Amino acid sequence: MSSPLTDRSARLQALQHALRERILILDGGMGTMIQSYKLEEADYRGERFADWPSDVKGNNDLLLLSRPDVIQAIEKAYLDAGADILETNTFNATQVSQADYGMQSLAYELNVEGARLARQVADAKTAETPDKPRFVAGVLGPTSRTCSISPDVNNPGYRNVTFDELVENYVEATRGLIEGGADLILIETIFDTLNAKAAIFAVQGVFEELGVELPIMISGTITDASGRTLSGQTTEAFWNSVRHARPISVGLNCALGAKELRPYIEELSTKADTHVSAHPNAGLPNAFGEYDESPAEMAVVVEEFAAAGFLNIVGGCCGTTPAHIEAIAKAVAKYPPRAIPEIPRACRLSGLEPFTIDRSSLFVNVGERTNITGSAKFARLIREENYAEALEVAQQQVEAGAQVIDINMDEGMLDSKAAMVTFLNLIASEPDISRVPIMIDSSKWEVIEAGLKCIQGKGIVNSISMKEGVEAFKHHARLCKRYGAAVVVMAFDEDGQADTQARKEEICKRSYDILVDEVGFPPEDIIFDANIFAIATGIEEHNNYAVDFINACAYIRDNLPYALSSGGVSNVSFSFRGNNPVREAIHSVFLYYAIRNGLTMGIVNAGQLEIYDEIPKALRDRVEDVVLNRTPEATEALLAIADDYKGGGAVKEAEDEEWRSYSVEKRLEHALVKGITTWIVEDTEECRQQCARPIEVIEGPLMSGMNVVGDLFGAGKMFLPQVVKSARVMKQAVAHLIPFIEAEKGDKPEAKGKILMATVKGDVHDIGKNIVGVVLGCNGYDVVDLGVMVPAEKILQTAIAEKCDIIGLSGLITPSLDEMVHVAKEMQRQNFQLPLMIGGATTSKAHTAVKIDPQYSNDAVVYVTDASRAVGVATSLLSKELKADYVARTRADYAVVRERTANRSARTERLSYEQAIANKPAFDWAGYQAPTPSFTGVRVLDEIDLAVLAEYIDWTPFFISWDLAGKYPRILTDEVVGEAATSLFNDAQAMLKKLIDEKLIKARAVFGFWPANQVEHDDLEVYGADGETLATLHHLRQQTIKPDGKPNLSLADFVAPKESGVRDYIGGFITTAGIGAEEVAKAYEAKGDDYNSIMVKALADRLAEACAEWLHERVRKEYWGYARDEHLDNEALIKEQYVGIRPAPGYPACPDHTEKGTLFELLDPQGLSGVSLTEHYAMFPAAAVSGWYFAHPQAQYFAVGKIDKDQVERYSQRKGQEASVSERWLAPNLGYDD
């Protein structure tokens, strides 16, 4: 007879085989079935607990001992229904949960019995059907307490359970489950990820102790419409936090029904490189807490999961029964299991939100001001235990651009461990801070470990090293791995810190090999700190410190696969402490070279970085001499001019307290929504004195504010930690009012219809949508505006919740077209019966007819050309008399468009890609003298004078944005629209003056020039100052057959080929006038003034484009200087009567939006422009323009047009990506269907 371990090993092999073959079935709700038995107190007690001093009814785990027959009968019923995996009835079998009944001493026994009983039932079923073995998952539930959330709203740093207590509980439970015969460990219903991390830590410890390793299943719980866990994490952030467990599956269960769970399971299925499970509830509970979704109804939804390829394991949770499981098993039986995707290696961190770093990422700013050793202010606040202001320091770092925050509490007179724990617990209740990953920084291991026990996300340990020997290094690394943290590894060994390049490389290589080969540490989670030491100290041996570090970064990048690099940047300038301008210049120059050589991240003051090209040349030259150790006299030369720059840094700390100027009612609402307690008592008192009775403060502004909080929470715009903060504010306000209270002992016309409007996911443009909304609102329609960047599931959920009559989608950038198709598909899948309106700059009748309309047949899909047509379309769609005829005509029209498009595509002949290359322009490069820019590198122009930019505005697009057709200035005297245009223009001038005079918005530009050459006909290599390749720009070539011998153009044609030997150049720019525009527009919206809100955004757009025009003129005449004698008025500029071009990625000459990412990497790796890119490469703020500069005298604007598959395949090869990825981004340009 084989041993139990051998039997378990055989079962696990069978499990792996089964997962490859089919979708496995998990059982259903145990609690649901127990309730069906209608057990009484006596059943729970049995003989053994007849005299137990407290009630035990409801302790379902106790039935393992008092009514095992019931538990096994339920388990057998699930196996008979088709379940492959039984969950043990041990959801609450931990001491902390059993303590509610005074039964904590039974925890171990309950887990043993739970696994033993399930094992018996599973083995009996396997004996009946040997070809289909059944498995037992030992359940570890979440417990009744949370490690990340305080149970006391007045004390956010308090916890009623610790990580260590949970580990102790889970260790005991895991031992019992293994002893009882479990095949797997299932950590489920995770609403607080820190609890789950404690469970993982415990389970892995037991495995190591017992010398056995079982597969781990992990299942989280998305609790509401926000798509987050109760403790605030998104689905991807949750996965990043637990993936170190290397689970056999990750999934979601409970809280939501299958329908509501779908978008989160879909996301998980694309992100997780392991099997995916789902065991949703039987719908959502009704008013009586019961579940109404029938087996057939639930199976229909779950079958969609399987058909879409989301599932490897599926079962049920609350409200599900054996009948549900049987229906689900039958529904998914015909579908193959989900194929596990290959996810690229990357350091995947998380706070409340995910954060991914890889070799292609822009430089990562790690905020340093929450480091006691780096900030005197922060140190003082911590010593004074002024944690409220200390949290503000952290928040300022995040708002200033820190993507990770470094927290260090090492100070001789401080209890560092206690301070670290307190501060991290408080951060957990501050979503604006805890959304980013945490770097726990300490030289004391006990402080690091205490910090790791406080963060639910995947953070970074700073640091471990071989300073105390290899064994201690490996011990700490193993623990970091078990806690699920990335690590900063110092270049430090038994002989001390590495100070030379050779020592840095030697220690980093040795550390890497030990971590990867001996510890099994993921290489992508290793971040080397090769030691940044102070330069310009006057000691000759220190002169090469910066060069050694920079070269070490390059070594790490080139020789240690997937590893990253970091450093404490302020160390390099320590010898100039007290002289902030010089220090900032040193930091900027140092980072400029270190980033180019592979530095991934740096601990910096996120709000205080000087711009490399903005450093005065005299200072920058001396600093570069010091940083790069170019001359022996570099230090003396820098010291000689250092005092000239002394007297304050480039960036000042400032607190934004603008909201304090609001009315007291608005201040109270703001405080409640933001969770600010600082002024709540004085504001409450001020409001009390304005009211007739103190109770009116509660019934009025306080309840109004809490209604806002409730609305935001219900809509998924706030989540639990924020609501807890709001409740704390409310309590303080009410507490102030109670003594005063005790001392005292129209009809609305019906809307024509409700229309939901949204700018789709990935797109931030909303001017057109807002105008349409205003027009519809003025015509009696109730408009529900979801804003920008709205995912499909939110659009559809809101349409149902708001009982909308029409859904309207808007988008400006080409990737939005795909997202609209996705929404249409989802509407069809979910059987919506609502009309769909499509609008936006990139949309068209042809795209709507060809791509969107065929995806949704339940109701009409209508392309709306402009705001003026929206009312007529809406009226037709909602009219009983007009709709049928209108929809029929629209569909017939679209059928014609589709046929015409198909015929045109079939008729159109194009050159092969090779033929198109052969027909490129023939320029005389041998005789070409490329103009040389006045500088190379990047410069920033901050707070550009808006009055100057106003002279460059092209007003014609402004009128078009308001749906007034005509060319400026003739439109002002147009017979039809002249009066309206003039009135609008006068209002625009008044608003423009206000924006300029009051400096309500700001304009900024980042631009640069680099040496460049054409390679492979259609690509451009961009070079650094030393000739190294900084980036490759990928362009496309026209393939349409040209008449009269005209060439097939590519933007690459306008730069000299590499083989010509000509040193040519390219430029790039980002301009924005949107800084502050969103806030100004929202202020008008808050007053109900949609007109001026839209006006502000429209003018910001025009100013951003004007800024691009103004800057291009300066480039031509000054910065590049190839047209110094140019004299063009604004009309000539608008007509593009200049030499050179400034094409924008995503537009006709370079239609691939992803190239914008390369432009931003070259121009703005530190985020100094104030403009960022969304996942679909839209710029935010929306009032922004970016593009390339070409100076060749024959450079011209053109459209690439339709291209064929041969070019797409070559383009994809050059970009190093799958052709399907290129096809998605180039969809409007594809001249083929498959």
Swiss-Prot record:
Bound cofactor: record note: Binds 1 zinc ion per subunit.
Main EC class the enzyme belongs to: transferase
UniProt GO cellular component terms: cytosol
Catalysed reaction, written as an equation: (6S)-5-methyl-5,6,7,8-tetrahydrofolate + L-homocysteine = (6S)-5,6,7,8-tetrahydrofolate + L-methionine
Binding sites annotated in the UniProt record for Zn(2+): 254, 317-318
Enzyme Commission designation: 2.1.1.13
This protein's record includes keyword Lipid biosynthesis: no
Keyword Transferase: yes
Domain Pterin-binding: 363-624
InterPro entries documented for this protein: Cbl-bd_cap, Cobalamin-bd, Cobalamin-bd_sf, Dihydropteroate_synth-like_sf, HCY_dom, HCY_dom_sf, Met_Synthase/Corrinoid, Met_synthase_B12-bd
Domain B12-binding N-terminal: 655-749
Residues annotated as domain AdoMet activation: 904-1234
Positions bound to S-adenosyl-L-methionine: 954, 1142, 1197-1198
The protein's required cofactors: methylcob(III)alamin; Zn(2+)
GO molecular function: cobalamin binding; methionine synthase activity; zinc ion binding
Gene3D superfamilies, sorted: Cobalamin-binding domain (3.40.50.280), Cobalamin-dependent Methionine Synthase, domain 2 (1.10.288.10), Dihydropteroate synthase-like (3.20.20.20), Homocysteine-binding-like domain (3.20.20.330), Methionine synthase domain (1.10.1240.10), Vitamin B12-dependent methionine synthase, activation domain (3.10.196.10)
Keyword tags: Amino-acid biosynthesis, Cobalamin, Cobalt, Metal-binding, Methionine biosynthesis, Methyltransferase, Repeat, S-adenosyl-L-methionine, Transferase, Zinc
Domain Hcy-binding span(s) in chain numbering: 12-332
Residue ranges annotated for the B12-binding domain, each copy included: 752-888
PROSITE patterns, sorted: ADOMET_ACTIVATION, B12_BINDING, B12_BINDING_NTER, HCY, PTERIN_BINDING
Entry's free-text remark on domains: Modular enzyme with four functionally distinct domains. The isolated Hcy-binding domain catalyzes methyl transfer from free methylcobalamin to homocysteine. The Hcy-binding domain in association with the pterin-binding domain catalyzes the methylation of cob(I)alamin by methyltetrahydrofolate and the methylation of homocysteine. The B12-binding domain binds the cofactor. The AdoMet activation domain binds S-adenosyl-L-methionine. Under aerobic conditions cob(I)alamin can be converted to inactive cob(II)alamin.
Family, per entry: Belongs to the vitamin-B12 dependent methionine synthase family.
Functional summary from the UniProt entry: Catalyzes the transfer of a methyl group from methyl-cobalamin to homocysteine, yielding enzyme-bound cob(I)alamin and methionine. Subsequently, remethylates the cofactor using methyltetrahydrofolate.
Miscellaneous information on this protein: L-homocysteine is bound via the zinc atom.
Protein name as annotated: Methionine synthase
Organism: Pseudomonas aeruginosa (strain ATCC 15692 / DSM 22644 / CIP 104116 / JCM 14847 / LMG 12228 / 1C / PRS 101 / PAO1)
